[in-house]
UniProtKB/Swiss-Prot annotation:
This is Integrator complex subunit 2. It comes from Homo sapiens. Component of the Integrator complex, composed of core subunits INTS1, INTS2, INTS3, INTS4, INTS5, INTS6, INTS7, INTS8, INTS9/RC74, INTS10, INTS11/CPSF3L, INTS12, INTS13, INTS14 and INTS15. The core complex associates with protein phosphatase 2A subunits PPP2CA and PPP2R1A, to form the Integrator-PP2A (INTAC) complex. Belongs to the Integrator subunit 2 family. GO terms for biological process: regulation of transcription elongation by RNA polymerase II; RNA polymerase II transcription initiation surveillance; snRNA 3'-end processing; snRNA processing.
Length: 1204
């Protein structure tokens, strides 16, 4: 085997190959260049040149005719041309037929070497036969030999064999054999495909030489031949004789055509075959390019294979490296050895002053180690050094390369060299440090370990200088700190992730291999106290954003906060975190939110139970206010902002998260002597939360998860800022319409000042034009631009209540208020509530605060009574009421949690052993009861507002239901009737206010159905039932609790329940309504038997009209209701029988009406029955009740007869 390899290496050394110059001339058919070739070079190309000269060309141009003459002149003096001409004179058609017959014969004989049709029995050896034969026979000899080899190749199933052939081995006849081979392939391409011929030539001696000549005479076939050889090649070429021969042949081809060498290398990678060839071609290219300072092609190529995204290529090349190391022989002929040697030479070529660990020992005696021994890495070599380090990391970590002692020594020297303070230098130091962690086996001797410690100490000393000089925020100092923290907290897996991330590759690092490095870091270089003290002094990253990659101070601080190092060693970190939050920009860095969360945890949770006071300090209120300077009020809101919107949003996230965590940890904090305090309500009032949330909404892509986190905190702590109507209104304000309005924005709209607006309001209602013009212009401004006008708008709302103010002004003010509500709701609400207080002479108005309104939301409804009949301002009032009701719930829940910590101590003093949970339950129940009372009171007040005042009744406003009012307008036919009714129509102020109130009540009932139940158990004026049932869509939920309401012992509640049910049955004629109505009829029948005379009159007089509604909604109840009515009449008649006999005819009529309703239909239409002709005021209550029964029956009959 070894002899065969030696033969392969030396077989072609004495032969002359086609030069790159000659091949290029053949490719381009450059006759001038061909004429300049020497005779030996020209001899190799004769087959192609002779064919060009003799065969009829496809190109009939004059230029080719001249070139052809030059070729003929060139060939005229060459003796070998005659023999090639003779070869071309043979009958190739007959030759091809004989070859085909021989192929068929061999196929039948199973590939055996039987009688040949092409060549008769040979008298002598193949070489002598070739020498004595004429041209036709020479063609047959070579063709027969070639076909035999090709057949054997096809039958070998990929197993390589070496075929000994005199014809291809005799140095005397190589050129003649090559001529014959080229002519055969050119004239018989279908019989001898060039790729198959190339494959066959690999199996004979001098095959690479023959292959190069063949391709040189058919230069267009170069890529086809190379691709075919690579495709049929081995996955690992250095493992077999065939692979090495194939690699050598392709290498010779690429030397002949160097311009295509890299393309051939690309084919190698694409097919994942012949890795040695890819490396060999790269080595050849590297030697030719002579690149000293830049990264060599070899480094780029191998790095691309191992660090690329193609896992198949990575595995294929890694196998090549591993297999190469497993072979015991590692001679200079090995491609892997050549590659390693070349890489080592490149590494040594960029090293600073050559030094070793021995020099360190000598230097320690007489000089400082950083004077001359540790000379720096040249700036032009830094990038190349980084690339080499990454390549060696990939070779060792991915491909499993085991470095030799020399390689390890030189690598350690390079890693511990000192680069200049440039961004590339920072990158190089980070890579070197991570490589030391990943491959600690490179440090094997005490001297090398000392060298590493000295270098790490230099890193710590020079870190600040590097950061200031290079201008790179992500310096290696942060990485040192981070690794030290990970070692102290024994987070070895985190170190491994950090190393892999920095190196940019996933390599296997055993945690046990880091044990020595851990000892060095934690005991010699970075103690935990040193790490903590140093971290605070690290400058914050300026304009920190996600665009700044790498390991930053924020990563170190985050890990130290997680491990509670700051509190453990009593180091204040609050100022650093505050400064870093101020120095932020978009896109948001992903480490900022986790940093805030862990910082809040360190404020509220002690580091250890033994030291409960070991916590960090929270950010002060003044520092928070400084962040929002320019956003808190002021006319120039856009000009005064010192800090970015990112910083403001992060501080808002900190405050909301802090308050939430404070409430969640009240029981834990109760044990602390120095308890963290909640931020004051005055501070929260000054922060424009809604404005900031709106800003965040437009920056969702750049803020990552911050916007969604803020929405979650807002929904939990400030539900009144998350009202659905507000979001819908916001969509309208920020949508397409807003863009169109901005296009209409004129300079006049921008020039109106708040002072001008105040002067215009002062002229109302005498002069409405000016204020109308200004506020119409203001509608074109954005929400943030309207903020300076908020105080003027709200303070003048009370003037708008005076008579004579146009509705358009009111509606425009309402529109502006809603726009302002999207950016400053809390401040706006407080100003509006104070502005709408009733003006009482000689009584000083109280100025309410945000806290007052959250404690008692009903203050909102203690406004000027004129607001109740001003729909645009009532809409604003209802909006505020809804918000403050929600805010009150959140406030009380937070207050309950805040004061929870005081309860256990009180329980202990009382001595309620084993009942410590009872007070909490009671407090929760009391809170819920308070909230329910608050909500129900608000509903009752709103319902009372829906009732017409005495003045409105005097003016003829109809207090009837919304449903009946709508029907009356629809059915009115007289054109002048609407004029007579005045404002009693769908557009009157009372009707509009009723609609607004019904909408709010609907929302409240849907949000909490218990409110509806509580309100209806309390009851309200029955005149409002038509309005509430028709105007509140969610009133159908009352059907669930009406049976319970009817079962109440109070007669008033029973009456209210039946009246409510009668309206619900008309509005919702559902099976459920029918069952409840049937229950009500049965209850009425039961009560008839138990009620006294007075209570009977009080109960049935208001409820009997409800029976008509039951029948109208559900005709099947007709029989039961008629029986009930007659039963009531009989009971009443029996009570008055002894006093008067007038009642008997009524009972008789009732019986007749029930039995023959059709006969009484005309009588029922008589006005005396409908209106009642008798004086009921002086009648007995039972008599009055009987007459009421009669009217009810007649109404039911009229309804049934008319088909209604």
């Amino acid at each position: 085997m070894k002899d065969q390899q030696t033969v392969i290496m030396t077989e072609c050394t004495s032969l002359q190959f086609v030069s790159p110059f000659a091949f290029e001339a053949m490719q381009k058919v450059d006759v001038v260049c061909l004429a300049s070739l020497s005779d030996p070079e020209l001899r190799l190309l004769l087959p192609c040149l002779v064919r060009m000269a003799l065969c009829a060309p496809a190109d009939q141009s004059q230029s080719w005719a001249q070139d052809k003459k030059l070729i003929l002149r060139l060939l005229s003096g060459v003796e070998a041309v005659n023999s090639i001409v003779a070869l071309l004179s043979v009958d190739f058609h007959a030759l091809e037929q004989d070859a085909s017959k021989e192929q068929q014969l061999r196929h039948k004989l199973g590939g055996g070497s039987g009688e040949s049709i092409l060549v008769s029995q040979l008298q002598h050896g193949l070489t002598l036969e070739f020498e004595h034969s004429d041209s036709p026979r020479r063609l047959r000899l070579v063709l027969s030999e070639l076909l035999a080899i090709m057949n054997k190749v096809s039958e070998s199933n990929g197993e390589f064999f070496f075929k000994s052939s005199e014809l291809f081995e005799s140095p005397v006849y190589l050129e003649e054999a090559a001529d014959v081979l080229c002519i055969l392939q050119a004239e018989l391409p279908s019989l001898l495909p060039i790729v198959d011929v190339a494959e066959a030539l690999l199996h004979v001696r001098n095959g690479a030489w023959f292959l190069c000549l063949l391709v040189a005479n058919v230069p267009d076939s170069f890529n086809e031949v190379c691709r075919g050889l690579i495709k049929n090649g081995e996955r690992q070429d250095e493992e077999s004789l065939g692979g090495r021969r194939r690699t050598d042949a392709l290498r010779f081809l690429c030397k002949m055509n160097p311009s295509q060498a890299l393309k051939v290398r690309g084919m190698v990678v694409e097919e994942c075959h012949l890795p040695g060839l890819g490396v060999a071609l790269t080595l050849d290219h590297t030697k030719n390019e002579a690149c000293e300072d830049g990264v060599s092609d070899l480094v780029c190529f191998v790095s691309g294979l191992l660090l690329g995204t193609n896992a198949k290529v990575r595995t294929w090349f890694g196998t090549f490296i591993r297999n190469g190391q497993q072979r015991k022989r590692e001679t200079s002929s090995s491609v892997l050895w050549q590659m390693r040697r070349q890489l080592l030479l490149e590494l040594m070529g960029i090293l600073p002053t050559v030094r070793s660990t021995r020099i360190v020992e000598e230097a320690d005696v007489d000089m400082e180690p950083n004077v001359s021994v540790y000379s720096g890495l040249k700036e032009e070599h830094v990038v190349k050094a980084s690339a080499l380090l990454r390549l060696y990391c990939a070779l060792m970590g991915i491909a499993g390369l085991k470095p030799t002692e020399e390689e390890a020594e030189q690598l350690l020297q390079l890693m511990t060299s000192r680069p200049p303070a440039t961004p590339a230098g920072v990158r190089f130091v980070s890579l070197s440090f991570c490589m030391l962690l990943a491959f600690s086996t490179l440090v094997s001797t005490p001297e090398q370990e000392q060298l590493m410690v000295v270098w790490l100490s230099w890193m710590i000393k020079e870190e600040a200088y590097f950061e200031s000089t290079s201008g790179v925020s992500a310096s290696f100092g942060e990485m040192l700190l981070l690794v030290a923290m990970y070692f102290h907290s024994n987070q070895l897996s985190a170190i491994i992730d950090l190393v892999c991330s920095t190196l940019g590759m996933k390599i296997v690092i055993k945690p046990s291999s880091l044990s020595r490095m851990k000892t060095i870091f934690t005991q010699e270089i970075f103690t935990e106290q040193v790490v903590t003290a140093h971290a605070v002094r690290v400058p914050v990253t300026s304009n920190l954003s996600a665009n700044i990659t790498g390991f930053l101070p924020i990563h170190c601080i985050y890990q130290l906060l997680r491990s509670r190092s700051f509190t453990k060693h009593k180091v204040s970190i609050k100022d650093w975190i505050y400064r870093q939050l101020c120095e932020t920009s978009t896109p948001l860095h992903p480490q900022l939110l986790p940093l805030i969360d862990v910082y809040i945890n360190s404020i509220l949770t002690p580091a250890s139970k033994s030291n409960p006071e070991a916590t960090n300090q929270p950010v002060t209120e003044q520092e928070i206010l400084n962040i929002f300077q320019g956003v808190i009020g002021g006319d120039n809101i856009r000009l005064n902002q010192r800090f970015s919107i990112t910083a403001q949003l992060l501080v808002l996230y900190y405050i909301l998260s802090y308050e939430e965590a404070l409430l969640a940890n009240t029981k834990t904090l109760a044990a602390m002597q120095r308890k963290p305090k909640s931020y004051s309500s005055s501070l929260m009032d000054q922060i424009p939360i809604k404005f900031l949330i709106r800003q965040a909404q437009g920056l969702q892509q750049e803020l990552g998860g911050l916007h969604s986190a803020l929405l979650r905190l807002l929904a939990t702590n400030y539900p009144h800022l998350c009202i659905v109507d507000d979001w819908i209104c916001e969509e309208e304000i920020t949508g397409t319409d807003a863009l169109l309005r901005r296009m209409l924005l004129t300079n006049n709209a921008k020039n109106h000042s708040p002072k001008q607006l105040q002067e215009a309001f002062s002229a109302v209602p005498v002069n409405n034009t000016q204020v109308m013009q200004i506020i119409e212009h203001l509608t074109l401004l954005s929400a943030s631009e309207l903020i300076p006008y908020a105080e003027v708008l709200t303070s003048n709302m009370s003037q708008l209540l005076n008579s004579g103010v146009p509705r358009r002004i009111l509606q425009t003010v309402n529109k502006l208020w809603m726009v302002l509500n999207t950016v400053m709701p809390r401040r706006l609400w407080v100003m509006t509530v104070n502005a709408l207080q009733p003006s009482i002479k000689f009584v000083r108005q109280q100025k309410y605060t945000q806290n007052d309104l959250m404690i008692d939301p009903l203050i909102v409804l203690r406004c000027d009574q004129r607001v109740h009949r001003c729909p645009p301002l009532m809409d604003i009032t209802l909006h505020m009421l809804n918000g403050y009701l929600l805010a009150s719930k959140a406030y009380l829940s937070a207050h309950l949690k805040e004061t929870e910590q005081d309860r256990p101590s009180q329980n202990n003093t009382i001595g309620l052993v084993g009942q410590t949970d009872a007070p909490e339950v009671t407090r929760e129940e009391l809170k819920n009861a308070l909230l329910a009372a608050q909500d129900s009171a608000a509903v009752q007040i709103l319902l009372e507002i829906c009732l017409p005042t005495e003045e409105e009744k005097a003016n003829g406003v109809n207090p009837d239901s919304l449903l009946r009012n709508v029907q009356s307008v629809i059915t009115t036919s007289a054109p002048n009737k609407g004029m007579e009714e005045g404002e009693d129509n769908l557009l009157c102020n009372l009707r509009e206010v009723q609609c607004l109130i019904c909408c709010l009540l609907h929302q409240m009932y849907i949000a909490d159905p218990n409110i509806a139940k509580l309100v209806h158990f309390q009851g309200y004026p029955c005149e409002l039932l038509p309005l509430t049932v028709a105007g509140i869509p969610s009133m159908h939920i009352c059907l669930d609790f009406i049976p319970e309401l009817i079962a109440q012992p109070e007669l008033e509640k029973q009456i209210f329940a039946i009246q409510l049910l009668s309206h619900l049955c008309i509005q919702y004629a559902l099976p459920k309504s029918l069952s409840v109505a049937r229950l009500a009829v049965n209850v009425m029948g039961t009560l008839l038997t138990v009620l006294t005379q007075a209570k009977r009159y009080a109960f049935f007089m208001p409820t009997l009209p409800s029976l008509v509604s039951f029948c109208r909604a559900f005709p099947p109840l007709y029989e039961d209701i008629m029986s009930l009515l007659i039963q009531i009449g009989q009971v009443c008649a029996s009570d008055v029988a002894t006093q008067t006999r007038d009642i008997d005819p009524i009972i008789t009529r009732l019986q007749q009406i029930k039995e023959k309703p059709s006969g009484w239909s005309q009588i029922c239409k008589d006005s005396s029955y409908k209106n009642g002709s008798r004086d009921t005021g002086s009648m007995d209550p039972d008599v009055q009740l009987c007459h009421c029964i009669e009217r009810t029956v007649i109404e039911i009959i009229n309804m049934s007869v008319s088909g209604i």
